[in-house]
UniProtKB/Swiss-Prot annotation:
This is C2 calcium-dependent domain-containing protein 4B. Residues 113-166, 194-234 are annotated as: Disordered. It is found in: Nucleus. One of its GO terms (biological process) is positive regulation of acute inflammatory response. Keywords: Nucleus. Specifically expressed in endothelial cells. GO terms for cellular component: nucleus. Residues 248-364 form the C2 domain. It comes from Homo sapiens. May be involved in inflammatory process. May regulate cell architecture and adhesion. Its main location: nucleus.
Amino acid sequence: MRLLEKLCSSAAGSSAPKPAFAKVLTPNRIPEFCIPPRLPAPCTLESPIRAAAVPRRCAAESDLWPRAADEDAGRTDWDPRSQAALSLPHLPRVRTTYGFCALLESPHTRRKESLLLGGPPAPRPRAHSCGGGGGPDAPLGTLCGPRGPGPATPAAPGGPRLPQDALAAGPRRCRLLRVPDGLLSRALRAGRSRRLARVRSVSSGNEDEERRAGSESPARAPSSSPLSSRAPLPERLEAKGTVALGRAGDALRLAAEYCPGTRRLRLRLLRAESLFGGAPGPRAVRCRLSLVLRPPGTARWQCSAVVGRSRKASFDQDFCFDGLSEDEVRRLAVRVKARDEGRGRDRGRLLGQGELSLGALLLL
């Protein structure tokens, strides 16, 4: 390349030495800013009105464009470089609050707002001149930035919508997904409560629902069968009993409750009597109870939480069995097993078991 430059310079006969780095930009060699115009298609012809209103001159030219004497009265943005940029039809523009036009975004870079507000890529509408007459191009109101689908709002009487309005409406359309507060803590609590969900007491809402269903069932019975002579079912059947666990003095107090309206059987473990008589200390007192409804055809098994660190074991835990008719409850019996959940070799040792008939307990 240097050899070619030397040959060209020697052929031209120029004796002035050229700088070694001619293509390096320095403050003394900064070129004029020039926006190249977009070349029109060879088959399209511009109208004479538009050709007169859109001068295709470069901003790097030294001379100014000729203008009429009364042109300054109606325009306040007469600048050769801005006019050169605004004369290009493929650059979007917007009307400012002061009444003159400005570029919507730089032709070489994109603003952050346009990146945030940008939706799916769509062909950019062509803009018409600020002072030009009506043409086939889109109006300035459509050049305020890409808008999402939504109800159209009327424009201000002084002109189209401002770009600030379009920017202010952007975060509403591009709302980011936020993680709810306390999500991790709720997940941790849910993991702990999942293990105890089977043995927790039924909430007051369920009790109210049972009471409501039980109160509605007697009222519906006479209306459905007014000629039946059978007495309406009571709201709920409640009873308390004791289950002997097979060892001397070991027993378990429980309460049974059956609601015919909801067909739900609830067994509440109240307390254990003399279950840990031979335990050396409160630290070794750990017990778990399991309940099984028999006969095996309708066997349902549930397990209680571990009760420990107390010689007076107070359970106060509920076991709910849904979908049981009155005839099934009359034939069912509950079998209770108590196992040691302590440490060492005694872990899992059977402390006792017993069985109680629900029909005899609830007097069905």
